[in-house]
């Protein structure tokens, strides 16, 4: 299927590894030009039809600078993918999570997307429309314990923003949707200081045992495995495509059947 993305201009945040890098590769494979932002851009060097920009997307100015780069380079922004985010496991639960830690979670998972969206929407309105895909999380509506209380609250705010903006800007040609992954085989879960290792240290077990224990405690996957970054990217690119031109304000879960409720 032709996703009709050839020649389109896409901006991707947190694009240098994991889900973000997979999204960049998937967009390029569909013929899009990608302006890709991250703190470190070594992994993006030399990629065809990719303009990397080293930028702090957690800063007040960073997201708008990335969008401005796309406008400078290509004169338009057809697609924005807000992939910026981060989680730090809060072993002390709600009472052990400070205002500063909540502020960090909101900065990483909500305000970065808000700022990039504001800049992109301003441009999209001048050109007659565009598509925005926010990478949220199942933690926006699924909290097995207090360990991700700040992260979940920030992602819930992002999902709410998506719904609100879809109503405001849908009549003006801008579509906005969410993709909410469950656990994905990236460094966030499996890397150094990732969720599995952090839980394992607290429990006195290794990271593999901790990963199995955490997943079992929340009901396990129907598919029996983590989602891959490439699978998330496929869903993101589909929602960015003009082929899904009447899809907006929706939240698509990709979690291997982790969530059991309707």
What are these regions (language model features)?
Residues 9, 16-17:
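Conserved glycine-rich cofactor-binding loop
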Residues 87, 133-157, 162-171, 183-184:
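Catalytic loop of short-chain dehydrogenase/reductase
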Residues 90-94, 98-103, 132, 217:
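Substrate-binding pocket helix/loop in short-chain dehydrogenase/reductase
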Residues 91, 225, 236-237, 248-262:
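Short C-terminal tail/terminal secondary-structure segment
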Residues 117-118, 163:
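A short, exposed helix-loop element centered on a Lys and neighboring polar residues
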Residues 122, 167-168, 245:
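Alpha-helical segment proximal to the catalytic Tyr-Lys
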Residues 170, 175, 247-249:
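Short, small/polar-rich loop/turn modules that mediate ligand/substrate recognition or access, typified
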């Amino acid at each position: 299927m032709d996703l009709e993305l050839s020649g389109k201009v896409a901006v991707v945040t947190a694009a240098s590894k994991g889900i973000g890098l997979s999204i960049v590769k998937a967009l390029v494979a569909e013929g899009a030009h990608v302006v890709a932002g991250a703190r470190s851009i070594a992994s993006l060097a030399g990629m065809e039809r990719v303009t990397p920009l080293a930028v702090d997307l957690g800063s007040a100015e960073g997201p708008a600078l990335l969008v401005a780069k796309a406008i400078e380079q290509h004169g338009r922004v057809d697609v924005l993918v807000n992939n910026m985010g981060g989680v730090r496991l809060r072993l002390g639960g709600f009472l052990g999570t400070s205002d500063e830690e909540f502020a960090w979670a909101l900065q990483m998972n909500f305000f970065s997307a808000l700022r990039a969206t504001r800049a992109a929407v301003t441009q999209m309105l001048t050109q007659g429309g565009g598509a925005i895909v926010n990478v949220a999380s199942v933690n926006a509506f699924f909290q097995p314990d207090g360990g991700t209380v700040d992260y979940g609250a920030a992602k819930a705010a992002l999902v709410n923003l998506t719904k609100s903006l879809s109503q405001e800007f849908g009549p003006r040609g801008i579509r906005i949707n969410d993709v909410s992954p469950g656990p994905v085989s990236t460094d966030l879960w499996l890397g150094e200081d990732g969720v599995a290792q952090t839980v394992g240290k607290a429990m006195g077990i290794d990271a593999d045992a901790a990963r199995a224990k955490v997943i079992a405690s929340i009901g396990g996957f129907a598919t029996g495995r983590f989602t891959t970054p490439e699978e998330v990217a496929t869903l993101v690119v589909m929602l960015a495509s003009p082929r899904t031109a009447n899809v907006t304000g929706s939240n698509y879960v990709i979690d291997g059947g982790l969530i059991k409720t309707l």
